[in-house]
Amino acid sequence: MKTIIWKQFGASIDMLENAVRACPEALWGDRSQKPEFWYVAFHTLFYLDLYLSESDAGFTPPAPFTLDEMDERGLLPERVYTKEELQKYLEHGREKCRATIASMTGEKADRRCGFEWLDLSLAEMLL
């Protein structure tokens, strides 16, 4: 079962990677696009990282990213993140996802996820 879940999750991460790589530079930081392409990729990676964590308590994304993404006012990052920065974040997320799935047990999968705003088991949240 872990292999099946990883193949599907991994394929989704691969598709995001393909989109990031294929995005033309002119579109990447185009402020006229709402939402901006780079921001959609960042938002996806941030929440992949967060939801692969035990809970939001103590969660810190890797530098140069911050917790501003969780601000209820919808603050955008202070600058446009580069493709290279998001590619590194994607690799971080891919490895974290692989490790999370590999260490999954039936007991762990049935546990409530550690995010108070989600009434789901860990398995339900990941699917």
Predicted regions and their residues:
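Hydrophobic alpha-helical core bundles mediating ligand binding, dimerization, or RNAP-core interactions
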Residues: 9, 13, 20, 90, ...
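Acidic/histidine-rich alpha-helical segments that form the ligand environment
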Residues: 73-111, 123-127
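Short, contiguous alpha-helical
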Residues: 6-10, 14-17, 25-72, 112-127
